[in-house]
A protein has these predicted regions:
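Acidic, serine/threonine-rich low-complexity disordered tracts
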Residues: 31-121, 127-130, 135-236
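Bacterial N-terminal signal peptides
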Residues: 15-26
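Bacterial N-terminal signal peptides that target proteins for export
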Residues: 2-17
Length: 236
């Protein structure tokens, strides 16, 4: 059977923990955060050429705050039988480039996880299934939509609150298919507690992700034009 997850999907013994530097990053934090209008980013998730689900991020403004709603839906079938399901719901609140709060729930093939992050002064309070405590307030969650994550040495799990130690290596520009067109994208390799590759376009927007599942199969995120309505609703 196949078990995988790019950080949100990281579990000891079942996953190749996956699910994110240069002056070029200085202006890329604007990416999705500073696009302004309500908008969405949508990925089809593929395993070895088979579509197994989706990952969607919806961005909206409320005054000075940016809200990011995230939904992941995955299902793996074998001989018409579902052998794996994964559902993740997450809401982030940002202001001025700082994470104020994040709350997520996950059903990882029947195993439940949750995490609540809240800004407390210069720190971030973490209350998760696998970790509870305080961390520096500039620590980013493993939701990957900010290219700024590629400067991080530590990330906090958006699934269960664990702290991941990572090393990120920039690998240069490549052509990547994003929403039906080829774009130049910066490629990064993330290794350590997480093991995956990510790509960001000239505006700093996340456009691709790949990693190997524990069975050796290739999992790939392909960015596509978003459907009008999030499947399954917000789930918050």
């Amino acid at each position: 059977m196949l078990w995988f997850r790019p950080d949100f999907w990281s579990r000891t013994g079942r996953a190749a923990a996956a699910f994110f530097v240069l002056a070029a990053l200085a202006g890329t934090a604007r990416g999705a955060e500073q696009q302004g209008a309500e908008r969405s980013i949508f990925f089809d998730v593929w395993r070895e050429g088979s579509l197994i689900g989706s990952h969607r991020l919806d961005f909206s403004r409320q005054g000075e705050e940016l809200r990011v709603d995230i939904a992941i839906e995955l299902k793996v079938d074998f001989a018409y039988i579902t052998v794996f399901r994964y559902q993740h719901r997450n809401r982030e609140i940002w202001r001025g480039g700082r994470l104020l709060a994040m709350q997520s729930t996950t059903d990882d093939d029947g195993e439940r996880a949750r995490v609540l992050l809240q800004a407390k002064g210069e720190e971030l309070a973490v209350d998760g299934t696998k970790f509870a405590g305080t961390v520096p307030g500039n620590l980013l969650p493993t939701t990957y939509w900010r290219e700024e994550s590629m400067r991080a040495a530590r990330l906090v799990s958006s699934q269960d609150g664990r702290i991941f130690e990572v090393t990120v290596t920039p690998l240069g520009e490549e052509d990547v298919l994003s929403e039906g067109r080829l774009v130049k994208a910066r490629h990064y390799s993330m290794r350590g507690d997480l093991d995956l590759d990510l790509w960001y376009d000239a505006a700093g927007e996340w456009v691709r992700l790949t990693f190997k599942a524990s069975d050796g199969s290739l999992i790939e995120y392909r960015r596509v034009t978003p459907p009008a309505v999030m499947a399954g609703g917000e789930g918050q």
